[in-house]
Structures are given as structure tokens and as C-alpha cells.
């Protein structure tokens, strides 16, 4: 059964529809650095996952926090938007969800940027503990974020594990990103559920798949791209040069081109 929930989203541009899904604790505005480049050739729908960003604080009663539930909720959103088989793309957890949606036949293509779901047990523990530490720090710093991120050094210290070049984030983007992480009500439950799960059945994917990994990803290590290649026969593997886990801030041109190439018929 597909559960429906109203998600916050932005829709702009013209062309084939491309749905953008952010990662855990993130928000739809994380795609802003690549948006102008994309919407010249695609109708772009950037959404907030349930319980994150501006989407409803509480998902429907009885909804679990796992990847399967999030996939079902986003699938319901696609129905509400009249998007039968759009191109799909996502970062981190959003990349994993894009692949799951594509397995269900909900997409014409899937592009995953440093997707979650391809870690071994040790790597998954490292990522979980890292993110738990990140969110605790974010909750402590959130009341002072406006003043704090006027300093480039503060941006480096706060986002260095997620972005290869944190000073390319503006103070306003840094503040908003930290607040989105600190205030996300479904973060802890979603993180624990995702850490215990893995991507499976990649051979069921019958649409074009691109896996792009930041070569300087310090959260989900770049070597996981090799595991993704083994699990998804025929996937196009791209290494994003000089990019971290959230590559949109590091090199918008490079990332936009990967998204455009991955969403061509």
C-alpha cells in the first residue's frame, strides 16, 4: 500500500521531469547551486523528505523510519504530483531512495550521488557515529549559528566531513543547513533504521543508472562505489573530482552535468 503525505517541494524549469531527493537531515535547498543549470533543460522538482526540511513534522501514524517507508511516501508524493515515471536523482540517503524507486518502476532513470546503502558493517558504523556526532554538535550550535558562520573557519570545522570546500558555502547556506540538521524531528529514527539496512537486488534495476561518488567523500568512502558497481550491473560509475559527500557546493558545474547526462533518454 502506498501511503500519501504532503511533502514540501519546489518546481521549476521546463523539459523532462527530474525529481531531486536530499539526504538525511538535509533540505531541498541543497540543490540550489545546480538548479539554474538543470532547469534550463529539465522540469525540476526538489522535495523535502518526510520529517525533514519543511515537510510535515510527523509522518502518518504507524509509519516506520526505514528506507522502505520513505520510498513508499515519496512514491505517493509522485502520484499526487502526477509524475508517473520521472527521472530520479538523490544524494546520500536520497540517492538510495532514488534507486529503490527505480526498482519499483517509478523512474525513467536514476542518478545517485554518494548513495547510502553500500557500506559494509564497519563503514556503516563509522557513518552512523559520525552523523550522530554531527547532529549533537548541530543542536548545540544552532542558537548561535548566525554569528558563528560569519567565520570561514567555523564553516570548515562544521562541514568539513560533508563538503570538500566548506568555504564555498555562504554563511546563510551554512546556517540554514545546520538548522535543518539540528531541528529534523525524524533524524535519529531514520539514521538508526538506515544504518541497519543495505541496498539489495540491484539486478532488478532495468533503467539507466548512474552512481557518482565524490573522491573526497569523508562520510561514505569513495571505495563504496566499487561495491555499488558489483551490485548494479551496467551502472555508469562517475568519480566527482575534488568533491565531498554533498558535492553540489563543491563543483556545481560538474554535478549538474552528471545529473543532466544521467537523465537523458
Regions found by a protein language model. Give the residues of each.
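Flexible "cap/lid" loop of the alpha/beta hydrolase fold
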Residues: 107-142
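Conserved serine/cysteine hydrolase catalytic core
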Residues: 183-230
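Conserved acidic catalytic loop of the alpha/beta-hydrolase fold
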Residues: 68-86
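Catalytic histidine-centered segment of alpha/beta-hydrolase-like enzymes
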Residues: 243-256
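Catalytic histidine neighborhood in serine/cysteine hydrolases
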Residues: 230-245
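Conserved HGGG/HGGXW glycine-rich cap/lid loop of the alpha/beta-hydrolase fold
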Residues: 10-57
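Conserved alpha/beta-hydrolase catalytic His-Asp/Glu region
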Residues: 146-203
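Gly/Ala-rich beta-loop-alpha elbow adjacent to hydrolase catalytic centers
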Residues: 90, 94, 98
Amino acid at each position: 500500500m502506498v501511503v500519501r503525505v504532503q511533502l514540501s517541494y519546489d518546481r521549476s524549469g521546463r523539459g523532462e521531469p527530474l525529481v531531486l531527493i536530499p539526504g538525511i537531515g538535509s533540505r531541498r535547498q541543497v540543490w540550489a547551486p545546480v538548479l539554474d543549470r538543470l532547469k534550463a533543460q529539465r522540469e525540476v522538482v526538489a522535495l523535502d523528505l518526510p520529517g525533514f526540511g519543511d515537510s510535515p513534522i510527523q509522518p502518518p501514524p504507524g509509519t516506520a523510519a526505514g528506507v522502505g517507508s520513505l520510498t513508499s511516501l515519496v512514491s505517493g508524493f509522485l502520484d499526487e504530483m502526477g509524475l508517473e515515471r520521472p527521472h530520479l536523482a538523490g544524494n546520500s540517503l536520497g540517492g538510495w531512495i532514488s534507486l529503490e524507486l527505480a526498482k519499483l518502476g517509478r523512474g525513467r532513470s536514476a542518478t545517485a550521488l554518494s548513495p547510502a546503502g553500500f557500506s559494509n558493517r564497519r563503514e556503516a558504523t563509522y557513518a552512523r557515529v559520525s552523523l550522530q556526532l554531527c547532529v549533537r554538535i548541530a543542536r548545540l550550535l544552532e542558537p548561535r549559528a548566525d554569528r558563528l558562520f560569519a567565520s570561514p573557519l567555523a564553516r570548515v570545522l562544521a562541514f568539513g566531513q560533508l563538503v570538500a570546500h566548506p568555504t564555498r558555502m555562504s554563511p546563510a547556506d551554512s546556517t540554514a543547513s545546520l538548522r535543518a540538521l539540528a531541528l529534523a524531528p525524524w533524524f535519529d529514527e531514520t539514521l538508526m533504521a538506515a544504518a541497519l539496512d543495505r541496498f539489495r537486488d540491484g539486478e532488478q534495476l532495468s533503467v539507466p543508472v548512474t552512481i557518482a561518488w565524490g573522491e573526497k567523500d569523508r562520510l561514505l568512502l569513495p571505495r563504496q562505489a566499487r561495491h555499488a558497481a558489483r551490485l548494479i550491473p551496467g551502472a555508469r560509475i562517475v568519480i566527482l573530482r575534488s568533491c565531498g559527500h554533498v558535492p553540489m557546493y563543491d563543483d556545481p558545474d560538474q554535478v549538474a552535468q552528471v545529473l543532466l547526462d544521467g537523465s537523458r533518454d
